Design a protein with these regions (language model features):
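An acidic/histidine-cluster motif and surrounding catalytic segment
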Residues: 1-82, 86-194
Length: 194
């Protein structure tokens, strides 16, 4: 259904509560449990000049960055990335199959979950696919082919939250689409990003 070389679930090892809920989500959707990617805990890194409030932001950013790096090193053609606070829609599998049949062949990034910020209208491509114009969120996405390298190359410096940086710096450079309406959401579980 995801047809990925690798599917990742980012999880801080001490957040077993989030891992348990994520596992329930994938079981309910009939999807094999993704490979757990141990999230970077920036609180354990010795970062000079880093304000404590930024540690969660840095850890999240680096977790996504190192997944992209691993994908490049292993020659993966398509990966899916989920954060451990993801909630899959009740009809996730059917909606994903439907959307994958509609997404243009040249896609490089596909948001399965996201938040639309106001200000810019999205462009409707098909019944279930839009082009993002002002989108945040990294809780559920796929990236493929040279999109993996484009993302990796454009995330060499941490300037902001990763989803903001992707939206502002990377989305305009790639064939990026959203499944619309979204099929993944974020739970209200307490976040480790302040």
């Amino acid at each position: 259904m995801l047809h990925c070389d690798k599917t990742y679930l980012i999880n801080l090892p001490h957040r077993t509560d989030r891992l348990r809920i994520a596992k329930q989500q994938f079981d309910r959707a009939g999807i094999a449990m993704p490979t757990i990617f141990p999230a970077i805990d920036a609180k354990r890194l010795k970062l000079r000049g880093t304000v404590e409030d930024n540690q969660g932001l840095i850890g999240c950013f680096l977790s996504h960055y190192f997944i992209l790096q691993e994908a490049l090193l292993n020659g993966y053609k398509r990966i899916a990335v989920f954060e451990d606070d993801v909630l899959l829609s009740a009809n996730f599998s059917a909606r994903l199959t439907e959307a994958m049949a509609q997404v243009p062949d040249k896609w490089q990034m596909l948001y399965m979950g996201y938040y639309e910020r106001s200000g810019k209208a999205k462009v409707q491509v098909s019944e279930n696919i839009t082009i993002p114009k002002n989108t945040w969120g990294t809780h559920a996405y796929m990236v493929q082919n040279d999109g993996i390298k484009i993302m990796y190359d454009n995330l060499q410096t941490i300037r902001s939250h990763i989803d903001v940086q992707i939206s502002e710096d990377i989305v305009p450079k790639m064939y990026t689409y959203c499944i619309s309406p979204a099929i993944c959401f974020q739970s209200g579980i307490k976040s480790d990003i302040k």
